[in-house]
């Protein structure tokens, strides 16, 4: 009789340990970048988000409105601002090359810069940002993000979890599912080591590119930027028009 009781106690103890381990709070804080007017996208994100993981909402500025875009004119390279104005006034105008952007992209850029400032002000060590058309389809995403922190510790600046395109650094290949990159496109979801990024923040200015492709500049200055494919956990909802006005 004693043996079965002991077995039950052991099983209960193991179960408690497993549950305790799986419920361990992540070492990072999450942020959601959205617009006040993007209620549907925001609510869809929140419907799929685990509320036990700390989340702060960043409401960006809608710079598709010229009066809002003008606030940032002084931190944008003049030629890029002029081209953005041309795109605003002429629907048939094309961009000189892929680094040029429309007015709406300015607000997106500054929303990501607001993310950095909040992380610095709150003395966070690690932080993750989601854009509001991300849909979390598998709760493993939180563990996958924590795994990057567990593996890299202080030895990285950023890790992207979604991309449209990238240029791998084949000389720094890893077997852990992490891929170091020299260039990457898309800022839908990424992790930063806050302290390590402090020295790179100034290099985001002046604005002369889209925020995602601007990371090429900090990579050239030594930032260790990685990519981890989390498409099995994340889905990008493209059923609605771009909130920055891109086609």
What are these regions (language model features)?
Residues 5-130, 134-247:
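An acidic/histidine-cluster motif and surrounding catalytic segment
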């Amino acid at each position: 009789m004693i043996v079965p009781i002991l077995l039950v106690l052991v099983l209960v103890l193991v179960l408690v340990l497993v549950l305790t381990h799986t419920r361990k709070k992540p070492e990072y804080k999450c942020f959601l970048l959205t617009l006040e007017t993007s209620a549907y996208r925001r609510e869809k994100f929140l419907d799929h988000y685990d509320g036990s993981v700390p989340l702060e909402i960043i409401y960006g500025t809608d710079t598709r409105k010229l009066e809002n875009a003008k606030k940032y004119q002084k931190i944008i390279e003049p030629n890029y601002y002029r081209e953005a104005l041309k795109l605003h006034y002429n629907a048939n105008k094309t961009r000189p090359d892929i680094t040029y952007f429309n007015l709406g992209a300015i607000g997106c850029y500054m929303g990501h810069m607001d993310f950095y400032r909040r992380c610095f002000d709150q003395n966070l060590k690690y932080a993750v940002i989601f854009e509001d058309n991300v849909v979390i389809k598998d709760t493993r995403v939180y563990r996958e993000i924590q795994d990057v922190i567990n593996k890299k510790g202080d030895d990285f600046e950023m890790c992207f979890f979604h991309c449209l395109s990238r240029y791998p650094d084949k000389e720094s290949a890893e077997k852990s599912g992490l891929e170091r990159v020299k260039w990457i496109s898309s800022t839908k979801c990424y992790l930063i080591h806050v302290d390590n990024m402090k020295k790179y923040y100034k290099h985001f200015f002046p604005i002369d590119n889209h925020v995602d492709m601007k990371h090429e500049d900090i990579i050239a200055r030594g930032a260790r930027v990685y990519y981890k494919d989390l498409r099995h956990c994340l889905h990008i909802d493209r059923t609605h028009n771009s909130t920055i006005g891109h086609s």
